[in-house]
Amino acid sequence: MKPRLIFQYFAYSFLVFLPFINTLPCSYQNPRIEDVLLEVPIEHHHPHRHRRDSENPTETPPDLQKFAPLRIQLHYDKSIQNLTAEVQHFVNTTLLPEAVGYWENALRVRPMKTPIRLRRKCISSFYYYKQGMRNVACDKGCRERTTCGEADIPNDHLLDCLACNNTDDCQTTGEMGEGVKESDFILYVTAHNSKRCEGPETLSYAAHCQQEADFDRPIAGNVNLCPSALSVHNHDYEILTSTVKHEILHALGFSVGLYAFFRDKDGKPRTKRNRYGRPTSLNKQRGYYDWDKNTITTVLREEWWTGEGKVIHPIQMMVTPKVREEARRHFGCDKLEGAELENQGGEGTVLTHWEKRAYENEAMTGTHTQNPVYSRLTLAFLEDTGWYQPNYEVAEDLHWGKQLGCDFAMKSCGEWIHQKRILGEDAYPYCSDIKHDGTKSMAITRCTSQRDSLALCNLIPFQKELPPQYRNFMSLPGVNPDGAKYYGGSVEMADYCPFLQEFEWKMPEKEHKDSRCELEGNGKEGEDILEVYGENSKCFEFPKPWTERKCGRIRVLSHYMAGCYEYQCTNGTLYVGSYNATDMYPCYAENQKVHIKKVVDGWLREGSLICPKCSDYCSSCGPPIVIPDYIGDPELDEPCFAFSKFSVFGLFSCYLAILYIRF
C-alpha cells in the first residue's frame, strides 16, 4: 500500500484543515524456516511419550481431550521499560491485556497439563530424531541465546540441551527451566525501534516461533510494538488495539507458514506428512511448507469483467469446511468455492490475509482502512486449523458484501458498478464520485453504510495506467475517453475498487481529528453545517448542499452532502438536533426532510437533513403518522450590518466580509 493520500478542499472554510484518507498496511513477515522450532514436547497425558514413537506420523494423536479457554501468558521484554511512563502504563494495563483478552475469550484449545518448556536453538542446522527421545537433539550443541522474534527467551522458559555426536552418543547439558505454568501460549512483548518500524505506517508486528509436537499448534510468539507509533490519544485507541489483535492472530495461526500444519476436526493432518511427521514439500524459495489443495486452491475466473473487455483472473481460495460454509453464508452464495485470499501487497500480505475487495473492513485483511471487525469468517478459519474451538458469540458483524449474492462475491467490482449503472441503481458498497482529478478537489462527504462516520469516495487518478485486470471503468463523467484506465480506488489491495472511506482532519500544529461521529473531539463549535459530535451522534445525509448568506452574498458548501448530528429516540420517534438548537427536530418517516435555518457568527446558515428509517437508530418505533408539510426552523432574514451612527464602521465591516468571501 502507498502512504496516506492528502488533498485539500478549496472552499475557504476548509483551508485550515488537511483531510486525508488513512490506510495502514499490515507489516507481517512470515518467519524464516530456521527461526521456527517444531516438535516442542508438551507432555499432555503421557509425559514420556513423544509423537515420533508412532510408526505412522499421520495417525491421530490420542490426546483429543476436552477443550478449555485459551490461556496466553504475557512476558514483557526489558525494552518495554524504554517507553515513557504514560505509554508503558497504557501498554501494560490496557493495550496488551485487551488484545490478549479478546482472543482468550474467543478461543478454546486442548489445554496444557504441564508447564510449557520451549526448545533451545541448535548451533548448526542439523539435528537428530530418535525413537523415545523426549527432545530434538542438536548436532553440535545449543546456542547460548534462544530468541523468539525480537525477544530473548529466558533460560527459565527453556528445556535443557540435548546434543548428539551420532545417534547413539548423546548427552544432556544445561538445566531445564521451570517453564511457564498454566498457559497454552507464551507471547513475548517487545518495544524495539527496529528497521521494520522505520516505515510511518508500521504500528506493530508479530509472528510465531515454536510449535508443539502433538498437533503442531503454535505455542510461543513475539509481538513487537514500534515505540514511535504508540499513542495514548483517544482517536488512536481503536486502530492500535485492532492492530495488536491482528498481529497476535498471525502468531496464533493466521500465517502462510502454518497452513501446511492444519488439522481436520479429528486431529488428522490436512496436508500429507513424511515419515518424520513434517509436510512432504518444503518451498525453500518462499520459505514455507506447501499445503494440499484441500486447504487452499487456485480458482480461475475466466470471464473477469474490465472496462476494456474480459480477462482470465486467477484467485487463491481458502476452501476448508468451516471457511467455505461461512463465506457462502455471508454473501448468500451457495456456489462460492471458499473465501478469497489477498493477491496483492507483496510477501507477508499475499495469502496471509483475506482479499480486501471481498472483505473490506474485516480486520484480517491486509490493510486497515476503517471500522475493523473480527467476523465469523475469521473465527471459522481458526476452527479449521484444528487447534481451536471458537466462540462465535464474540464475532462482530461484517456488513461489507453481506447477502449481496454471487455476483458481488464472484465477479469484479467493475462489473458490479457497470451493471448497477445500467439499472439506474446505487452501486453500494462501491461508489463513483471522483475525489480529485489531480488538480482540484471534487470530494463530497457521504455517510458510511452504518451511519457512524462521514466518508469520502476514494476514487482518484493514478500517474500510471492501472493493471489491465483492475481497470474497473469504461468511462467516467468529466474524464476524457482515454483517461478512465488511470482511475481507481486509492486502496490498491482492494483491486483498485472505489468505496466510501473514513478520513482524518489534520490541523496544522494540532492533533488529528477524524470523521467518526461518536468522538466529541472531532467537532468544532459553530462550523459551517452546524454539526454535533459525541456519543449520541450519527451521520445524516443532505438532499442538496448547505448555503451561507450575508449582505447579499451567498456561499454554497458543495463539498458537504452529509454531516454528524445528535439524535435521540423518544416515545417511538427519532429526533435529530443541530448546533445552537434549543429543541430537537422530529423524524416521522424515512426520507422526510428537516429544514435548519440559524444565524451564527453573522451568517444565515441553511440546510436540510434527510431522515433515515427510525429502526436504523431506535430499538422501538411508533406507527406511521401523517407528516406535516414542513418540519424545521421558521424563515429568517438574511443578516447584514445596518447603517447608523456607526455607519462608516458598518460599511467597512461589510466590505471586509465581501473580501473574505471572495478570498
UniProtKB/Swiss-Prot annotation:
Its main location: cytoplasm. Metalloprotease. The lineage of its organism: Eukaryota, Metazoa, Ecdysozoa, Nematoda, Chromadorea. GO terms for biological process: cell adhesion; cell division; proteolysis. It is an enzyme of class 3 (hydrolase). Binds 1 zinc ion per subunit. It comes from the Eukaryota. This is Leishmanolysin-like peptidase. GO terms for molecular function: metal ion binding; metalloendopeptidase activity; peptidase activity. It holds the Pfam family Peptidase_M8. It is found in: Cytoplasm. Its cofactor is Zn(2+). The keyword Cell division applies. Zn(2+) binds at residues 246, 250, 353. Keywords: Cell cycle, Cell division, Cytoplasm, Hydrolase, Metal-binding, Metalloprotease, Mitosis, Protease, Zinc. GO terms for cellular component: cytoplasm; membrane. It comes from Caenorhabditis briggsae.
